[in-house]
């Protein structure tokens, strides 16, 4: 079996997923796609175009960590590459990344360099969110001291974005996989924190570059996305800091975004986003992506019940069944 198992999760991003898999052709890796109850024919398209890719076709919608946990538990590689469907690369560099991890046995997570489609670098590694980093963010208005990605050398970082993240299975076996109480956002930060406490390292690895196209799944629902992002951050603060520390972090972060909204008040779109971030940093109000998935699952359950009542059901396909 290959050393690397690729865990891809997809929700209604058929074309992005197919482009990602196209760029993975020839990679020496086990590739597993979990389709998160898509309605755009994603699973069928993957089966048709990539017969060597294993597909787990899920009938309900779950969160980022829960979905990747399903794939991690179903794969066998010594390393698991957690990957967004909205990524591509001209050179995934699995051999280089595996060689680096083999040579550095206490490194549990390796995050490659991320760039936008136009080549601009994307911040992909940061310091852990804490009262101290929140205070620094307030003083500098978010301009300094938190991002750790960048440069040409491999370096230790606090946490790296799970849009593309190579994980050592041995370390996951020790500390556990993603905490499924995080629906989406901050689950990789929490995992990196648990790894650090157990003596493992996370590193930024700029010798592999991944293009992050940023999925449009949440396009049109920016408020829900922002709500979910801050819900994850509040859970992280509450899990890893005292109640007082979590409150200080929330207030400093909210004040930072409020100040940025005031400074650029004439830019209505920007100021509006900053005010929304400020509100949610202090305390999330309103539904997020979790509720969107729950509503969809509830609606599908009601439709299935109606079909059963009228005798129009068919046996559902099991996860991974061709």
Predicted regions and their residues:
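Short, well-formed alpha-helical segments that are part of the catalytic scaffolds
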Residues: 12-26
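A short, conserved alpha-helix in the catalytic core of glycosyltransferases
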Residues: 158-209
């Amino acid at each position: 079996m290959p050393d690397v198992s690729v865990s891809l999760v997809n929700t209604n991003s058929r074309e992005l997923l197919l482009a990602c898999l196209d760029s993975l052709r020839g990679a020496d890796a086990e590739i597993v796609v979990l389709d998160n109850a898509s309605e755009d024919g994603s699973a069928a398209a993957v089966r048709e175009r990539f017969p060597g890719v294993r597909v787990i076709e899920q009938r309900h919608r779950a969160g980022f960590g829960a979905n990747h946990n399903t794939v991690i538990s179903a794969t066998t590689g010594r390393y698991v590459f957690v990957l967004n469907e909205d990524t591509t690369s001209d050179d995934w560099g699995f051999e280089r990344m595996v060689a680096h991890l083999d040579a550095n046995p206490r490194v549990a997570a390796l995050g490659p360099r991320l760039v936008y489609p136009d080549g601009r670098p994307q911040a992909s590694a940061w310091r852990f969110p804490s009262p101290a980093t929140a205070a620094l963010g307030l003083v500098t208005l978010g301009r300094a001291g938190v991002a750790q990605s960048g440069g040409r050398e491999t370096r230790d970082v606090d946490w790296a974005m799970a849009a593309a993240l190579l994980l050592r299975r041995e370390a996951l076996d020790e500390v556990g996989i993603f905490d499924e109480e995080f629906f989406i956002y901050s689950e990789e930060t929490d995992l990196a924190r648990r790894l650090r406490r157990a003596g493992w390292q996370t590193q930024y690895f700029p010798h592999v570059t991944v293009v992050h196209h940023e999925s449009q799944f949440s396009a049109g629902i920016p408020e829900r996305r922002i709500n979910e992002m801050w819900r994850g951050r509040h859970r992280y603060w509450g899990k890893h800091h005292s109640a007082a520390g979590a409150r200080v972090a929330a207030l400093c972060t909210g004040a930072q975004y409020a100040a940025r909204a005031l400074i650029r008040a004439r830019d209505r779109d920007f100021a509006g986003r900053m005010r929304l971030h400020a509100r949610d940093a202090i305390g999330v109000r309103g539904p997020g992506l979790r509720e969107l998935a729950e509503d969809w699952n509830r609606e599908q359950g009601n439709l299935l019940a109606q079909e059963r009542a009228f005798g129009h059901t068919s046996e559902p396909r099991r996860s991974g069944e061709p």
